[in-house]
UniProtKB/Swiss-Prot annotation:
Organism: Drosophila melanogaster (Fruit fly)
UniProt keyword terms in alphabetical order: Ribonucleoprotein, Ribosomal protein
UniProt-recorded name of the protein: Small ribosomal subunit protein eS7
Pfam (any one): Ribosomal_S7e
Name of the encoding gene: RpS7
Lineage: Eukaryota, Metazoa, Ecdysozoa, Arthropoda, Hexapoda
Top-level taxon of origin: Eukaryota
């Protein structure tokens, strides 16, 4: 199995060494695991490694049409990749594009109206949901400070606390690196005890 089939970069550029190592790990997982039927048709678009404090995290970007299939196997896939990359936290995010806000004096106005899924807010919210998968976001509070900076408090599903609580610091730093926004994650008790 060729590594080139596992990483297809937009624009046809060549992958770097780190991206090749991720693609090689995917090829090895496909060769000797029960993920083979899922991984056969899947590929990634790019990968990068970020450092925060003394830890490192791996961000893997996948095409949006393949995101649902990746999410079916994401728990097992992330666990296996974390073993291969010696305990670095692995995060899978869909490759999304932000279109600029149309201005009134645009020389070449957009042929179509900008879709909601390409706005900055929608893309940042989608990145947040991709980060915390398989947990669900059950609430969100945005606190605007007097200097204009924002602090986003994200409430996650209490049922998933044991599975992702150890990754919360990773999620915070990855989101800050990707979007420049501060975010904190909480696991509030259920308000409605039915």
């Amino acid at each position: 199995m060729a590594i080139g089939s596992k990483i297809i970069k937009p624009g046809g550029s060549d992958p770097d060494d780190f991206e090749k190592s991720i693609a090689q790990a995917l090829v090895e997982l496909e060769a000797n695991s029960d993920l083979k039927p899922y991984l056969r048709d899947l590929h990634i678009t790019r990968a990068r490694e970020i450092e925060f404090g003394s830890k490192k995290a791996v961000i893997i970007y996948v095409p949006i049409p393949q995101q649902k299939v990746f999410q079916k196997i994401q728990i097992i896939l992330v666990r296996e990749l974390e073993k291969k990359f010696s305990g670095k936290h692995v995060v899978v995010i869909a490759e999304r594009k932000i279109l600029p806000k149309p201005t009134r004096k645009a020389r070449n106005p957009l042929k179509q109206k900008r879709p909601r899924s390409r706005t900055l807010t929608a893309v940042y919210d989608a990145i947040l949901e991709d980060l915390v998968f398989p947990a669900e976001i059950v609430g969100k509070r945005i606190r605007v400070k007097l200097d204009g900076s924002q602090l986003v408090k994200v409430h996650l599903d209490k049922n998933q606390q044991t599975t992702i609580e150890h990754k919360v610091d990773t999620f915070t730093s990855v989101y800050k690196k990707l979007t420049g926004r501060d975010v904190t994650f909480e696991f509030p008790d259920n308000y409605l005890n039915v």
